[in-house]
Amino acid sequence: MKSPKPSHRRGEVWWVNLDPTVGTEVRKTRPAIIVSPSDMNAALPRVIIAPLTSKSHPLGCRPRVTFEKTDGFILLDQLRSVDKQRLVRPMGSIPEDHWLPVLLEMLS
C-alpha cells in the first residue's frame, strides 16, 4: 500500500536541501516556509519557498518569527522555486498573518 503524498500546503515549514547554490544564495539544508498557494503546489512538481534563518539582520522584507522555540527571520528576499524532491521532511507551519502581508507588500 502506498503512503499518502505530503500536502505541501502554504505556510508549512520543511527541511529543504538548497545546494548547490551560486553567489550569495542561502545554502545548505535548512528550514524553509512554502509561500506558493496550496492549489498551485498540488498541480505542479515545484513549490516556492522562503528560507528561515536565526542569523540575520532585520530588514523590512524579513519578518521576525519564532519557530520551534528559536527566534529568527523569514528571508522573503531569498524566494526560490524548488522541485519537491528538495523537500526533505515537514517540520510544522507558521500562520500566514506572520508573513503574508510582508510578501504582498514586496510584490505590489
Which ranges hold each PLM region?
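Conserved functional hotspots at enzyme active or ligand-binding sites that engage polyanionic ligands
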Residues: 1-108
